[in-house]
Amino acid sequence: MDYKLYDFDNKSILRSGKRWFPTMGEIHYSRLPHKFWKEELCKMKAGGVDIASAYVIWIHHEEIEGEYDWSGDRNLHGFILAAKECGIKICLRIGPWCHGEVRNGGFPDWLLHKDFEPRTNDEKYFSVVEKWYAQIYEQVKDFICRPDDE
């Protein structure tokens, strides 16, 4: 069959040529003990959720500048694996600023003491954010949706 995986018309999104009305939920993995991730994600799937969005909250992963923690309840890779096992797609909200009711909008405390203003076009700020995004990429590179993925 020759069609794009995702398309749309004036009525809906099409996935693999069929009408699809995605339902999305929210789960903050770094605020939930990792032993419950799969259970909660499978409950979401059973409730009709197709996609779960999740903040990657910077302050939860780099409390100390240059020291990243992707273990335990902060294991983004493991969280995505759990979602995959439950049949839920993940939409990451990588910020760097987040509105997840978290201190500093998720910015690490150390970032606020730098000689630049966060959330601006300052090159120094962009440089720090680029390092953060590179860390996220290392956690998710095996799961990035490509045009031929289901």
Regions found by a protein language model. Give the residues of each.
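Alpha-helical context
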Residues: M1, L5, I13-W20, Y55-I59, ...
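Aromatic-lined substrate-binding rim segments of carbohydrate-active enzymes
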Residues: W37-W110
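The substrate-binding groove and active-site-proximal loops of carbohydrate-active enzymes
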Residues: P22-H34, I57-N75, L111-K131
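N-terminal carbohydrate-binding accessory modules
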Residues: M1-I51
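Compositionally biased, intrinsically disordered low-complexity regions enriched in proline and serine
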Residues: K4-D7, S30, D69, A134, ...
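Active-site region of glycoside hydrolase catalytic domains
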Residues: D2, E85-I94, C98-E150
